[in-house]
Amino acid sequence: MRMTTGQALVKFLDNQYVSFDGKEEKFVDGIFTIFGHGIVVGLGEALYENPGELKVYQGRNEQGMAHVSTAFAKQNNRRKIIACSSSVGPGAANMVTAAATATVNNIPLLLLPGDSFATRQPDPVLQQIEQSYNLGITTNDAFKPVCKYWDRINRPEQLMSAMINAMRVLTDPAETGAVCIALPQDVQGEAYDFPEYFFKKRVHRITRPLAVQEEFEEALDIIMNKKKPIIICGGGVRYSEAGEALVDFAEEFNIPICETQAGKSAIKSSHPLNLGGIGVTGNLAANMIAKDADLVIGVGTRFSDFTTSSKSLFKNPEVDFITVNVSKFHGEKMDAHKIIGDAKVCIEELQAMLEANNYESSYEDEIVNAKKAWKEEMKRLTNIKYDENFEALIKPKREGCIEEFSVLTGGLITQTAALGVIRETIDDDAIVVGAAGSLPGDLQRMWETDVRDSYHMEYGYSCMGYEIAATLGAKLAEPEREVYSMVGDGSYLMLHSEMVTAMQEQKKINILLFDNCGFGCINNLQMSNGIGSLATEFRYRDENGKLEGGLIPIDFAKVASGYGLKTYSVKTLAQLKEALEDAKKQKVSTLIDIKVLPKTMTDGYDAWWHVGIAGESKIDGVNKAFENKEKNLKAARRY
C-alpha cells in the first residue's frame, strides 16, 4: 500500500485495540494537535485526507493538551489514549514536562513531535537546535530521560518496528508511560510501499499475570508470623480493578487499609477497615496504625517518600514488607518480599492460601479507635471559621498576613471548611482532579467518596498546571459525570489554556479556584524551616527593591468570564454553597473564584518529610530545622 509516512501512521493508529477481561475496545481515541510548520503539511495532511475513526482535537498549549491526554488515559484506567502531535522545537519542548508527568505516574501517553529534516538539506531549519559536537541532536532528544520508549523515524520503513514497540510499551501495565516517536518533517511526507499486514487490526491483550508459587509461599510464611499488618492500596489496585478483591482480603483477616493518592477511590471511604490517606499527606488514623504495624503489604504502590514519610513512618523494629506489583522494579523497593503479578489475581491467590492456614490478625479495638479519633478531627477541620475564636491551622510566621488578605479580598473562608461544603454539595459520583499545592494534602486527608474512580490525583510528578487540563481529560473520558478541578491560584497561573479547548469541545468542566495570593504550601515549608517569606507570596516589589510590598489582588472570575465561562466570586461559605448549587445547573464550563484565607490548610499528622535543609546558616531557625532533620533521618531506613 503506497502512502506517506504520515498517512501510514494514522492508518496504523486507527487499527489498535486493547482487550481486558474479555472486553475489547478501541485504544486510540484521537490525536491532539497544535500545528506548526514541522507537522502541518506532513502528519497534518494525513489527518485531513483520511483520519479514519480518529478524532482530531485542537490544543492551546502543548503541555496542556498532553496533560489532557494523560488524564484521559488515567480516567480510562490506561485502556484508551489520545495521541499528541506538535511542531518542531518549542512546540515539542513544551511536551517534555507532560511526558515526565505521564511516566512518573505510569500512564500511557503517545507523543508525536515533528523534527528537523532527516536529509539535513535545509539545516538549520526554523526552530532547529544546532550542536557543533553532534548534528544528530535535536530538541526531541530531551524526551529520552522522561519516556519509557523513544524513537526517531529517519526512513519511512522504520515506522513499522517503531510503532509496534510503541504499542508494546503503551499497553504493558508494568512498563507503560510516555512514548516519543519523533517525526522528521521531510520523512512525514515521504511515500513508501507499506505491507498491508502492517495495518491489520491489532488487539493488545492486557493480561493478569499470576506470580510464581514460591513467591506466594514465602509471603505466606511471613504473614503467618505477623499480628498487626496493614495494607497500602496504591494506583495499581485502581488500574487492575482489584478494589473488591482487596476489600474481601482485608475483611477476611481483619487487616486495615491505607490509601495512596493514586489508590484513593479504588475502595469505599466508608468501609470500616479503610483508614484513609497514609504518609506525609496522610491522616491521623492511618499514620497512628502504621506506626505500630509489624507488616506492610503494599499493593500496586511505588512506596514514594510521601507514602512512607521518607521511610520513617513504620517504627516497629520488627516490621517487614511485602509488595504485590506487576512491576519488578517497584516490587523490590523497601527490601520487600515481592509478589510480581496482577494485583487482583495475586490478592485472591494469597487470600486462599491464608484461609487454608486459618490466619487472622490480632487487632482488637485499635482500628475503631483510630477512625473515631480522625472523625472527631474531621469535624473540627470542617467547622473552622474566621471569627473571634479563630486559630490558624498553620501558625503564621508573618504577623498580620491573614488579616491583610481578608481586608484586601473580603475573603472569610477557611480552606478546610470550604472542602467540607464542597463535599456535601456536589454529586456523589463527581470526579475531583488535583495535582499540586496544599490541596492534595487536604484532599487525601479529608476527601471521602464511595464511588469508584472519582478521585483523580496526579501526585507522582505533582505537576503545577495539570489540574485544569486534566479536568478536561477526565470529562472527555466520562462525559456524563461532573468533573471539578481543585486548583490553587499558583497552579492556575501556571497553566489554564485548555479552558478554551473545553469551551471548543462543549465539554462542561468546573474549576474551583482556591486563591490565597501565593504558593501557600511552599511558603509553609519555607517558613517552617526557619527561612523568612521569600518569593512564595504574590506581593508587589516595595520601595526597598524587595518582594515585600502589598499582596497582589486578582479577579480570577473576571478573567475567566472573558473566555466564556460562567463565573462566581465567593468570599463566604454561604456564597460558596450557593455558587456550587448554581454551577450544577449550568450547561457551560464554570469557575468559582474562592478567596480562602492563608494558613487554613491542614498540617501533617505524625509524619516527617525529608527535605534538603541547609547544613550551615546564620539563621537560628534554619540550624534548628537542620538538627531536627538529622534526628529524624537517624530513625529512618537508609533505602
Swiss-Prot record:
EC number: 3.7.1.22
Cofactor annotation comment: Binds 1 Mg(2+) ion per subunit. Binds 1 thiamine pyrophosphate per subunit.
GO molecular function per UniProt: 3D-(3,5/4)-trihydroxycyclohexane-1,2-dione hydrolase activity; acetolactate synthase activity; flavin adenine dinucleotide binding; magnesium ion binding; thiamine pyrophosphate binding
Catalyzed reaction equations: 3D-3,5/4-trihydroxycyclohexane-1,2-dione + H2O = 5-deoxy-D-glucuronate + H(+)
A cellular component term, taken from the record's GO annotations: acetolactate synthase complex
EC top class, as a word: hydrolase
Residues reported to bind thiamine diphosphate: E62
Residues annotated for Mg(2+) binding in this entry: D489, N516
Pfam family of the protein (one): TPP_enzyme_N
PANTHER family on file: 3D-(3,5_4)-TRIHYDROXYCYCLOHEXANE-1,2-DIONE HYDROLASE, THIAMINE PYROPHOSPHATE ENZYMES
Family per similarity comment: Belongs to the TPP enzyme family.
HAMAP family in UniProt: IolD
Protein name: 3D-(3,5/4)-trihydroxycyclohexane-1,2-dione hydrolase
Protein species of origin: Clostridium perfringens (strain ATCC 13124 / DSM 756 / JCM 1290 / NCIMB 6125 / NCTC 8237 / Type A)
